[in-house]
């Protein structure tokens, strides 16, 4: 059902979604309060932003993203192997997923376990879980068997959502857990459709080189699993409800991500995030706060595993800023170059090894001889800081292949995000951002181009927010 609003014809689900959100926002108008005055050693501007978040953004991350894009409904939100999904269509999906979760028995505070990939189905599930007040438990297929079973059993959930591309790896873990129903998400469900209505992959020639499998595995899995197995299409309920959006606060738990697991192989540390964590990260990237160029309408490659905070934050930040997510379900250093060329994103996080492989192929592989990346404005290197030699080589390649020159007069040097003692995540408190200042340094006596910037003040606070030992 469609409803005409101004010059737009909007799906009834979207109208109902914003009606429920507006009702919750109006109910919060009388309970604004500041918590920060005189308690933290922070700048006046930072304090003002934190007060604004408390006063005007005291809700779930999903509500924040949906509110922020109220005027962007016709804009592309997701790109997936040639399929384009608008913000309106994405929010319709979120509505359907949220309603289906609630009708299945999920309530505020419950955990929704997921073994996902970067697909439209995962994005919809991510936002829907948060919208109804549940906690996303985003798991990796490589986690230790006993650890996986512990997390699944502790979640209390009867359901687990699984990308069928990883099912075979976790089958025994699921079979031996207390989970009752496995809901499968197929990598091929959101591929473009041909004239006969069948899904097809316009990049099949490239994917086939890497044995990437988009086929529907549900019938085989249904015969092999000890659990009830549903396809995501069988799980979804397309009805409507007056009670989908949960009235959450900033400090309500929202999602659980995991570190790389290098300390104890197979047993990565879990990190519980409140709505405040992701909304604060996103709000501080707004142009009026950061002073940086707006991300509005830019495209971001999402290819890092979705159990990491870095990827969940990349997704939430980009959607909050009205960006287009370029979804890549395969995290592979050797495939990264093809993801960049296929999607031509404006921004992408990636490991040093991924970027060096991209640069080597751009410079030496005849297949990439004529490739220019004029839309590729920002490179973010995850993990430890770049060596001077690596940075020099990446900068050389960026100049040669004209990275980002549609938006900037010359290529921008890579930005590096790392943790002391960690790899590829920014979920810890010991986070340092490295920002290229484009200043001239002596190549002989000191590193060049990267200057450390403090990202967070580390302090011990009591329950009232005062400093203590």
Describe every region a protein language model picked out.
Residues 83-84, 98-146, 301-305:
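Conserved AMP-binding/adenylate-forming
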Residues 279-299, 307-349, 360-362, 455-457:
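Conserved AMP-binding/adenylation subdomain of ANL enzymes
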């Amino acid at each position: 059902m469609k409803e005409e609003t101004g010059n737009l014809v909007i799906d009834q689900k979207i109208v109902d979604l914003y009606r429920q959100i507006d009702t919750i926002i109006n109910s919060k108008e009388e309970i604004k309060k500041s918590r920060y005055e005189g308690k933290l050693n922070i700048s006046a501007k930072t304090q003002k932003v934190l007060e604004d978040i408390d006063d005007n953004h005291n809700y779930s991350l999903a509500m924040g993203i949906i509110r922020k894009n109220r005027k962007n409904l016709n804009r592309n939100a997701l790109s997936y192997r040639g399929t384009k999904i608008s913000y309106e269509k994405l929010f319709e999906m979120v509505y359907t997923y949220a309603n289906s979760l609630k009708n299945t028995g999920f309530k505020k505070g419950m955990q929704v376990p997921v073994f996902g990939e970067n697909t439209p189905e995962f994005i919809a599930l991510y936002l829907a879980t948060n919208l109804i007040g549940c906690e996303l438990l985003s798991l990796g297929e490589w986690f230790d068997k006993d650890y996986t079973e512990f997390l699944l059993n502790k979640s209390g959930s009867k359901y687990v959502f699984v990308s069928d591309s990883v099912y075979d790896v976790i089958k025994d873990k699921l079979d031996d857990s207390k989970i009752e129903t496995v809901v499968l998400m197929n990598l091929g469900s959101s591929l473009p459709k041909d004239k006969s209505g069948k899904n097809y992959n316009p990049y099949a020639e490239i994917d086939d080189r890497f044995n990437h499998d988009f086929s529907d595995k549900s019938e085989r899995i249904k015969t092999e699993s000890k659990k009830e197995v549903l396809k995501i299409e069988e799980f979804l309920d397309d009805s409507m409800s007056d009670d989908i959006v949960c009235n959450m606060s900033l400090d309500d738990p929202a999602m659980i991500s995991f570190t790389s697991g290098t300390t104890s192989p197979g047993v990565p540390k879990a990190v519980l995030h409140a709505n405040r964590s992701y909304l604060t990260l996103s709000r501080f990237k707004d142009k009026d706060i950061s002073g940086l160029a707006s991300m509005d309408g830019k495209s971001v490659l999402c290819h890092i595993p979705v159990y990491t905070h870095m990827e969940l934050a990349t997704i939430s930040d980009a959607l909050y800023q009205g960006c287009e997510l370029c979804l890549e379900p395969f995290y592979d250093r050797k495939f990264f170059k093809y993801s960049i060329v296929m999607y031509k994103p404006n921004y992408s996080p990636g490991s040093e090894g991924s970027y060096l492989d991209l640069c080597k192929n751009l410079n030496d592989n005849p297949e990439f001889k004529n490739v220019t990346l004029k839309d590729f404005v920002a490179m973010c290197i995850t993990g430890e800081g770049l060596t001077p030699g690596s940075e020099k080589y990446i900068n050389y390649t960026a100049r040669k292949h004209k990275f980002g020159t549609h938006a900037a007069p010359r290529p921008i040097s890579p930005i590096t995000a790392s943790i002391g003692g960690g790899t590829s995540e920014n979920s810890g408190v010991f986070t340092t951002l490295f920002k290229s200042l484009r200043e001239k340094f002596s190549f002989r006596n000191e590193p060049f181009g990267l200057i450390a910037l403090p990202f967070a003040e580390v302090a011990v606070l009591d329950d009232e927010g005062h400093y203590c030992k």
